[in-house]
Design a protein with these regions (language model features):
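P-loop NTPase switch/communication element
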Residues: 61-110
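Proline-aspartate-enriched helix->loop->beta-strand connector
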Residues: 113-120
Length: 179
């Protein structure tokens, strides 16, 4: 623990909320005959990316009449998706979901690939090169990726040096679509 904090000028408190059903129209539009495709949710800060991601995870994990349940692995580095307490998610993330809480994304993605047999791996707010490398590795193993990133649109994302090349490697241009 960092005990060197002092002279604090402000504190920001984020209160997460669950919005069940939020992801349903999006999942209907994305779902393909062979399952869930890798999906990157782009939006500016503060508009609900994490709330949407959590509901997508829950819906994929639980399944319904149109979609079978998926095995989902979450790498919840900052504890915002599942809000784990004593090993139990305090927010709904679905019945078939494994959560790695407080684990760095790159390490967690690798751990899930090796031990959890996920069909989908979900992470919130990707920012680091090592996270992208781990995601590319997972994509090459046949696992669908579900992630969020701060960007208003594809053009802004393409201007981020870290992601410009990765966009080409992760998805086929014919499958890029705006929903």
């Amino acid at each position: 623990a960092n005990t060197n904090l002092r002279d604090i000028s402000s504190v920001a408190v984020r209160i997460s909320r669950q919005v069940r059903g939020l992801a349903e129209p999006l999942l209907r539009a994305l779902w393909e005959p062979d399952g869930f495709p890798s999906t990157l949710v782009l939006a500016p800060p503060g508009v609900g990316k994490t709330t949407l991601l959590r509901d997508m995870i829950c819906a994929l994990s639980d399944g319904d009449e149109q979609r079978p349940a998926c095995r989902v692995g979450i790498v919840d580095e900052r504890g915002e998706l599942a809000a784990m307490y004593r090993g139990v998610p305090q927010l709904e993330v679905g019945a078939h979901t494994d959560v790695l809480d407080g684990c760095p994304k790159a390490l967690g993605i690798t751990m899930l690939l090796r031990s959890a047999n996920p069909q989908v791996i979900a992470v919130d707010e990707i920012t680091a090169e090592e996270d992208l490398r781990a995601m590319l590795s997972a994509a090459h193993c046949g696992v669908a990726l579900l992630a969020t990133i701060h960007a208003a649109n594809r053009e802004e994302l393409a201007r981020k040096p870290l992601f410009a090349l990765s966009l080409i490697h992760i998805s086929e241009p014919t499958r890029l679509r705006r929903i």
